């Protein structure tokens, strides 16, 4: 993540937008030496918002920890078991 003063960004905004749009890079923009804004690409912003949404769901952290423990102890299900459980037929080859 780069930190740049607003004076650097002003004349080259298009260039910096292109840079963050094509990467997961973020640019912290300072004003009078203090952080004032962060420039991120739209895809990265959407991803961050989705992550925040899921992390805000009650019990999600516990569910993830439980799933990790299941995987670590070998309690997993194969494709055939999942398809049978939910009544999903196999795809034709």
Swiss-Prot record:
Similarity comment text for this entry: Belongs to the phD/YefM antitoxin family.
The GO molecular function terms of this record are:
DNA-binding transcription factor activity; sequence-specific DNA binding; toxin sequestering activity
Q: How does it assemble?
A: Interacts with toxin RelG, which neutralizes the toxin. Also interacts with toxins RelE and RelK in vitro, in M.smegmatis coexpression with non-cognate toxins increases the toxicity of RelE but not of RelK.
Extract the NCBIfam families matched here. Answer: phd_fam
Q: Keywords in UniProt for this one?
A: DNA-binding, Repressor, Toxin-antitoxin system, Transcription, Transcription regulation
Species source reads: Mycobacterium tuberculosis (strain ATCC 25618 / H37Rv)
What is the documented function of this protein?
A: Antitoxin component of a type II toxin-antitoxin (TA) system. Upon expression in M.smegmatis neutralizes the effect of toxin RelE2.
The UniProt induction remark is: Expressed in log phase cells. Also expressed in human macrophages 110 hours after infection. A member of the relFG operon.
Tell me one GO biological process term: regulation of DNA-templated transcription
Q: What SUPFAM superfamilies does the entry give?
A: YefM-like
Q: What is the lineage of its organism?
A: Bacteria, Bacillati, Actinomycetota, Actinomycetes, Mycobacteriales
User: In its UniProt entry, what is this protein called?
Assistant: Antitoxin RelF
Coiled coil spans: none
Q: Which Gene3D superfamilies does the entry mention?
A: 1.10.1220.170, YefM-like domain
């Amino acid at each position: 993540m780069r930190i740049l003063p607003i004076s650097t960004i002003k004349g080259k905004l298009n260039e910096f937008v292109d840079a963050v749009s094509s990467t997961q890079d973020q640019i912290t923009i300072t004003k009078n030496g203090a952080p004032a804004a962060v420039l991120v690409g739209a895809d990265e912003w959407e991803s961050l918002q989705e992550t925040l949404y899921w992390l805000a769901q009650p019990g999600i952290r516990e569910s993830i920890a439980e799933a990790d423990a299941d995987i670590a102890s070998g309690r997993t299900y194969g494709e055939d078991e999942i398809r049978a459980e939910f009544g999903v037929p196999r795809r034709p080859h």
